Amino acid sequence: MDTQRFVLFLIFATSLLFLWDAWQKEQYPATQGPKTAVQGTETQANTGTAGTAETPVPGDQLASSVPQRGSTAENGAPVRAAGKLESGDKITIKTDMVLAEIDTAGGDIRRLELLHQPSKEDKNKPFALLESDPERVYIAQSGLIGEGLPTHKTRFTAEPGAYELAAGQDKIQIRLSAPEVDGVQVTKIYTFHRGSYLIDVSFEVANQRNAAIQPFSYFQMLRDSRPPVGSFFMVPTYTGAALYTEEEKFRKIEFSALDKGNASYPKNADNGWIAMLQQYFLAAWLPKDKLPREYYAKRLGENEYTAGVIVPVGQIEPGSSATVTVPLYAGPEEQSKLASIAPGLDLVVDYGWLTVIGAPLFWLLSLFHSWTGNWGVAIILLTMSVKLAFFPLSAAGYRSMAKLRLVTPKLQRLREQHGNDRQRMHQAMMDFYKTEKINPMGGCLPILVQIPVFISLYWVLLSSVELRYASFALWIEDLSAPDPYYVLPVIMGISMFLQQRLSPPATDPIQARVMQIMPLAFSVFFFFFPAGLVLYSLVNNVLSIAQQWQITRMIEGSAANTSKQKKAN
């Protein structure tokens, strides 16, 4: 009996420790020593067959042999030297979804605010996904590869000022012109759409030379490795690069692997996308399918990384022009929309190693939310559904615990009878359980069946942007963040204490003391967990207490009646 009680709590405590360890690793990652040079070529895997396409994608040798004015190339990937970004004229674009800032120095998107996503520092301000300041660098860059063609270091010209998507307009375009070089005129075009986080980035190339040209275009994200601001009290799911192809499916490219120079990912393909991910949000380049491309990811300097894609513009004859367009998705990881934007894009929502449980849990949560309009109520309904699904197992466990509670005095006498002879005492207890038809481990079932759901819901809360700033009631304004006043963890501890009172008392003094401090220890753990997870655990405990109390009352009542009948006879 003592063993099964101890194992029951040990299993749950171990689960909490695993989550705590994950939090520690994310919040305090091992630091990398300074490196004096950019890493060499990464290990590549499954390079694909895109080289058989009519228009070739530049490999390492081709791209590095192309002289570029105002830029450099390393192993075929356009890069920039680490350091401060140059600054030019600012152009701001506002739609119903985003507020963007484009700098004519490079024609980069230097800042992008998501108007429907509040900032963690101040929920009255929009969240800035892309930004460039002394503390953080995360920008979208693009350019062309070829003699005299503009790169992300070229100064473009455009009419500075503020642009806004007017009522009745479906899209707005911003055109930036590069200096004409040797008869080649290039225009970079940004197209913003109403009701969408997709931004089309295009290059129009007009060739007035006497010979044909065959340029390539590149599109990349540049960012540092710092985790998103405001994630101190919760675990970021992942911060780093990611890539998807139909052949290799979804693959993360961790910054640590880029530091070591051993990142492995498919390089050439004619499908897929590449992105930078962080908790709740992503920025992904989405070239159209059947277009040959080359993916790359690199460490540029201390705490600075890039991930991008090279695609061909095609051969442009004299007097002709060509256009290449690659959409950029920069926005929240909204699961209901990502799959329709690009194949595999919904895989960026990562529920950890229990995705097989986490995905159905989120689907069920979303269903309940569509009925109630409140994510907190949806969590309560989810808890009740899970409890109902596991009712037979829980009932069996609580019946076992109730029977153990009845025979606790006999077990105590067995312990006293055998004294310090633990081997004989253990054998006597096993014989006793067999005689009484009691499974000493049966009481573990209520906890065991909840552990996978508990861990899965933990990752659902930390990975689903739909639950970011989702309020419940009263002081709970963000179910994905810890309870700011620790009310739910304290109530959770009280409920655990009450549940403990219904359980068989421990006969071993040391285990008894351990069991007494368990509610307090778990309450401290729950201080750091999302309020939604604590709400789930609290409701589950309340339902468990009600179920356990009812079963215990029935069994004890039945035992009392049996005892009376024996005495009467």
Swiss-Prot record:
Its main location: membrane. Residues 32-52, 62-74 have a biased composition (Polar residues). The chain crosses the membrane at residues 6-26, 348-368, 375-395, 442-462, 479-499, 519-539. One of its GO terms (cellular component) is plasma membrane. InterPro entries: Membr_insert_YidC (IPR019998), Membr_insert_YidC_N (IPR028053), YidC/ALB3/OXA1/COX18 (IPR001708), YidC/Oxa/ALB_C (IPR028055), YidC_ALB_C (IPR047196), YidC_periplasmic_sf (IPR038221). GO terms for molecular function: membrane insertase activity. It is a multi-pass membrane protein. Residues 32-81 are annotated as: Disordered. This is Membrane protein insertase YidC.
